C-alpha cells in the first residue's frame, strides 16, 4: 500500500505521540542485562548523523549494538537504497521522491544515502 507522503508522516507522528503518552513500566534489571540491543535505523541525532546512513550504522557498531534495523526503497533503476520515507524531505530537507531518481542521480543529490548492497557488504 502506498500512502501519500504527507499522510504517511502524519500517521507515523500520530502513532509516536499516542504511544509516548502511555509509557511502559521499566523492565526488571535481569531482563535488561540479558537483552540484545537492535539499533533502529542506526544511532542518529538527525542533525550531525542522519538515520539509515553509513555514519549511523558505524556509530551503532562502535557502541556495541547486537544488530541494526534499516529500511529500503527502490530507485527508478531498481537499485535498493537505504531510506525510510518515500521522499527525502523529513530527513534531508529535499522535496523529491526516491523513486524519481536513478541511483547515480540520487547519490549526486544526496551522497549519504547508501545502497542496500553497500550496507550489507560493510556490516
Model-derived features: where do they sit?
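Phosphate-group recognition and catalysis centered on beta-loop-alpha active-site segments
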Residues: 1-123
Amino acid at each position: 500500500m502506498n500512502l501519500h507522503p504527507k499522510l504517511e508522516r502524519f500517521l507515523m507522528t500520530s502513532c509516536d505521540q499516542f504511544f509516548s503518552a502511555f509509557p511502559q513500566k521499566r523492565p526488571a534489571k535481569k531482563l535488561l542485562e540479558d537483552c540484545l540491543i537492535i539499533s533502529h535505523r542506526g544511532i542518529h541525532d538527525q542533525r550531525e548523523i542522519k538515520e539509515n546512513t553509513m555514519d549511523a550504522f558505524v556509530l551503532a557498531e562502535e557502541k556495541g549494538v547486537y544488530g541494526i534495523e534499516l529500511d529500503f526503497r527502490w530507485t527508478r533503476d531498481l537499485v535498493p537504497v537505504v531510506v525510510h520515507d518515500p521522499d527525502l524531505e523529513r530527513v534531508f530537507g529535499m522535496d523529491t521522491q526516491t523513486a524519481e531518481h536513478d541511483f547515480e542521480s540520487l547519490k549526486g543529490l544526496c551522497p549519504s544515502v547508501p545502497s542496500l548492497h553497500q550496507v550489507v557488504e560493510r556490516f
